[in-house]
């Protein structure tokens, strides 16, 4: 697959303009390139275009790409993990992940903390919230998180930097607005208690405008 660098650049610039237009704090917003469909050559092409913030959703592919893109040339690359993470796959990402977006249960958080201790690392993570309560999605309901939030922030080697969510693909614009507004309020609630809990990962190509209006800091 050959990448259309001109189209990518135009789309990127368009999103940058939307960030300035719609975000309450545009200086805090980051654009994450979801690289799960990219092979090594396509990834290299994006890197050569100057993009350096990537999200991968398969743990073993994450490991393989970081082994490939290693060394001085690639030292400014930032890699997040955005996919569903199985406990037995944590080992593939734990040594160098920048941010885990998909902590969808306390059990998973505890296991990540255990592996982080073993590797002498402090790992940054986001709690995945199932804001729409879809049965087909993983994630924690807002009210369930609020009931037991202290234990999520008590891990010795995992720092909860904020929250991640996805709106239903078939949701109407006003529904999406409602879901993202709930997430913004949740983030504000916990940022007051933990000033490092400042990230809100939400908004993809079909709904990022609504996400920006509601304080998203990471667009995927």
Language-model region placement:
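Divalent-metal-activated hydrolytic enzyme cores
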Residues: 217-219
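Conserved alpha/beta-domain cores
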Residues: 1-206, 212-214
